[in-house]
Amino acid sequence: IFTSEELGNYGFYNSIVSYFALFAMLGISIYGTKQIAASRDVSSTFWNIYIIQVITSGIAIVIYFFIIKLIPGMSGMIPLILAISLFGKLVDISWLFSGKEDFKKITIRNGIVKLAGVLSIFTFINSQDQLYLYVFFLVIFDFLGQLVMWVPARKFLRKPTFNKEIIKTHIKPTVMLFLPQVAISLYVVLDRTLLGVLG
């Protein structure tokens, strides 16, 4: 239903957002899973890692909004809508469930999110000028899927507690895991970014 040019624009915008999403998580998906799996105090470990995710996600969101305001090519509705995916990274705690080997909840969540997205797209999108609505459905259900995971997470978590020294010990390993992910991301999405810039 959408033209190749419209889908190309979406691919370009999405490639830009993916860089910020990568920074927002900063290797925490892998590192957090390992730490939760090995921890005897899951709640304390979770909060001391999650605060890093909050900070990096906050930085990513602020810089992203600054860029879409500054760069003419990033103006418009779709880049704004895609920002929702960065808020999704802010509340993404899938690594907690991965660390606890509770993959059932993640699988069910992913299935419901995809089904809701597909049903919404087929129900509400009926014209070529609704690309923004297509993108909205993709990101909003993913965001809601991340948000709802906080409900079952309560059984693992107590009141937030933070230890500056422990937080510092988590920073270097997350950065070290982040760097290879940057290389992979550049390999996967850089072509879309360059096509958008040069096009």
Regions found by a protein language model. Give the residues of each.
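Membrane-embedded alpha-helical segments of multi-pass transporters/permeases
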Residues: F23-L26, I61-K69, I81, V118-T123, ...
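Membrane-interface junctions at transmembrane-helix termini in multi-pass inner-membrane proteins
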Residues: K34-R40, G76, L86-N110
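Membrane-interface helix-loop junctions in multi-pass transport and translocation proteins
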Residues: T3-L7, F66, L70-I78, K100-K105, ...
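Interhelical loop/hinge segments that connect adjacent transmembrane helices in multipass membrane
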Residues: K104-R109, L131-L133, F137-L138, L147-V189, ...
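Helix-terminus/linker motif at the lipid-water interface of multi-pass membrane proteins
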Residues: I1-L7, T123-S127, S185-G199
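Residue-level recognition of pore/gate-forming positions within transmembrane alpha-helices
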Residues: S15-S18, Q53, S57, L86, ...
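Alpha-helical transmembrane segments of multi-pass membrane proteins
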Residues: Y19-F23, F66-F97, F143-L144
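Membrane-water interface segments that mark the loop-to-transmembrane alpha-helix transition
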Residues: Y13, S18-K69
